């Protein structure tokens, strides 16, 4: 009947509109994907995540050389992630703070805060403080206060002592800054309750002594 034809025609129109909307959403999502990937890559670069993985490895080494560990595999994995995140926040602050001197060096002139692919606003510092605080709290939840304090010491050493207080003023900046890696080892040993065991202490000292000649 005419009514059925009209209803069928109406359904067809609705179907076509829904299809067009679905295609529009799909194309819009596709167009945003490269931008999302680019932003992730920029944040990865700004946070010095590769260095963060080395710091994380130091924590795992601290756990490995400790005489015993009450931590489960999941707790070790979680602690490693929290150390990586905390290290990356101090790395990002380092690049934000040094963007003026980074701009005049060939090796660093393409960093995201220099090129302003990431706008160097103070909002970044707020987020970095929040993320650092969350990483510290999470570390406390999965381990103990001592490990958390060592992690804070590492963040503070690299982010403030090395970046703000020393780097522009003395050649000793690398020497003192090397403590950040040593603290990472102690995070691992403290999490197992073996901070003052000989092996992790020796490893932290060796790492401290290795850092200056490695960078020089």
Task: Please annotate each region the language model reported.
Residues 87-114, 212-216:
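Acidic (Asp/Glu-rich) catalytic motifs at the cytosolic membrane interface
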Residues 57-60, 111-112, 175-192:
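Small-residue-rich segments of transmembrane alpha-helices in multi-pass membrane proteins
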Residues 1-42:
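Transit-peptide-like, low-complexity N-terminal presequences
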Residues 107-149:
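Multi-pass membrane catalytic core of lipid/isoprenoid biosynthesis enzymes
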Residues 57-99, 149-160, 200-210:
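Membrane-embedded alpha-helical segments that form the functional core of polytopic membrane enzymes
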Residues 140-145, 164-172, 189-195:
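Membrane-interface helix caps and helix-loop-helix hairpins in membrane proteins
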Residues 60-64, 132-137, 159-164, 185-190:
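Alpha-helical transmembrane segments of multipass membrane proteins
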Residues 39-51, 113-121, 161-180:
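Interhelical loop and helix-boundary elements at the membrane-water interface
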């Amino acid at each position: 009947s005419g009514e059925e034809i009209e209803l069928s025609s109406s359904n067809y129109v609705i179907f076509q509109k829904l299809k067009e909307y679905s295609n529009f959403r799909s194309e819009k999502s596709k167009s945003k994907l490269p931008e999302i990937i680019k932003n992730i890559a920029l944040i990865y670069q700004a946070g010095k995540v590769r260095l963060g993985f080395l710091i994380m490895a130091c924590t795992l080494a601290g756990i490995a050389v400790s005489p015993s560990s009450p931590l489960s595999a999941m707790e070790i994995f979680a602690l490693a992630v929290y150390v990586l995140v905390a290290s990356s926040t101090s790395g990002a602050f380092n690049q934000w703070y040094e963007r003026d001197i980074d701009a005049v060096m060939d090796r660093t002139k393409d960093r995201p805060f220099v090129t302003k692919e990431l706008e160097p606003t103070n909002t970044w510092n707020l987020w970095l403080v929040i993320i650092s605080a969350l990483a510290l709290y999470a570390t406390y939840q999965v381990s103990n206060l001592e490990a958390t304090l060592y992690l804070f010491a590492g963040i503070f050493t690299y982010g403030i002592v090395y970046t703000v207080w020393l780097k522009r003023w003395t050649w000793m900046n690398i020497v003192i800054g090397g403590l950040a890696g040593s603290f990472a080892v102690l995070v691992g040993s403290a999490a197992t309750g073996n901070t003052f065991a000989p092996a992790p202490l020796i490893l932290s000292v060796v790492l401290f002594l290795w850092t200056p000649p490695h960078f020089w």
